[in-house]
């Protein structure tokens, strides 16, 4: 069972990942690194994704490798409704703390 905090905590990297997933619906790890313009590093993105999945912010599934690419299946990530709410709460809080963000 996923443990869900009463007040979601959302470190900046997790907020960035949720923003990217909401823009694209679903992505795999290396797509997130590329879309973040290197703000996410290959070495930490999968640790962060695992932590986010434990918190219930995202879900993942294995997707078969494309036939032309060969290789291993890829893990694809998508935001959950709980993750969307956590991001909305985080964004609201950030705008309260820094009014310039509301513009």
Q: Which stretches of residues belong to each language-model region?
A:
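N-terminal helix-turn-helix DNA-binding core of bacterial DNA-binding proteins
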Residues: 7-46
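Basic amphipathic alpha-helical segments that dock to polyanions
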Residues: 45-55
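Beta-hairpin "wing" of winged helix-turn-helix
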Residues: 55-70, 78
């Amino acid at each position: 069972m996923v443990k869900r905090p009463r007040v979601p905590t959302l470190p900046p990297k997790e907020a960035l990942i949720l923003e990217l997933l909401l823009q694209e619906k679903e992505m795999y790890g290396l797509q997130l690194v590329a879309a973040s313009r290197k703000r996410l590093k290959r070495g930490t993105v999968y640790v962060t994704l695992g932590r986010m999945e434990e918190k219930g912010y995202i879900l993942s599934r294995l997707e078969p490798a494309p036939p032309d690419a060969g290789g291993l299946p890829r893990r694809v990530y998508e935001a959950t409704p709980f993750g969307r709410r956590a991001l909305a709460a985080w964004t609201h809080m950030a705008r309260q703390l820094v009014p310039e963000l509301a513009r």
